[in-house]
């Protein structure tokens, strides 16, 4: 079994707004449940550190960025939906085994010929 990856995440918030606090609460629950011991989270308040937001091109809050492992992924806005957060950061699919992913028929849900006549 290979060692688990380490995840580096940055959460950009604007003060202690309800959206910011909800994002932080949801994210901590996800990390403690699914990524315990293999993550580092940096919370950046863009009101206190506007230069960091500018450097990282953050235009809206809350924004969650997965820095490592590559590729960098961002999810902006409501972070209260656990599954949406995991899918948006491309973390959910890493947990699935190959047999889980390919359990359906090749022509089932994901057809590359969709929309062709």
Curated annotation (Swiss-Prot):
Record-linked InterPro entries: Circ_KaiB (IPR013474), KaiB-like (IPR039022), KaiB_domain (IPR011649), Thioredoxin-like_sf (IPR036249)
CDD domains to which the protein is assigned, alphabetical: KaiB_like
Keywords for this protein: Biological rhythms
Any single GO BP term: circadian rhythm
NADP in keyword set: no
Cysteine pairings via disulfide bonds: none
Keyword Ligase: no
Domain notes per entry: Has 2 forms, fold switches to a thioredoxin-like fold (KaiB(fs)) when bound to KaiC.
UniProt record similarity statement: Belongs to the KaiB family.
Subunit structure: May undergo a major conformational rearrangment; in the free state forms homooligomers. When bound to KaiC switches to a monomeric thioredoxin-fold (KaiB(fs)). The active oscillator complex is probably KaiC(6):KaiB(6).
Biological function: Component of the KaiBC clock protein complex, which constitutes the main circadian regulator in cyanobacteria; it may modify the ATPase activity of KaiC.
Miscellaneous comment in the UniProt entry for this protein: The kiaA gene has been eliminated from Prochlorococcus during genome streamlining. It has been suggested that the central oscillator in Prochlorococcus does not have to be as robust as in other cyanobacteria because the former live in specific niches of the Earth's oceans; they divide exactly once a day and at the same time. Thus gene loss and changes in kaiB function compared to other cyanobacteria, can occur.
UniProt-recorded name of the protein: Circadian clock oscillator protein KaiB
Species, as recorded: Prochlorococcus marinus (strain SARG / CCMP1375 / SS120)
The organism's taxonomic lineage, starting at the top: Bacteria, Bacillati, Cyanobacteriota, Cyanophyceae, Synechococcales
Gene designation: kaiB
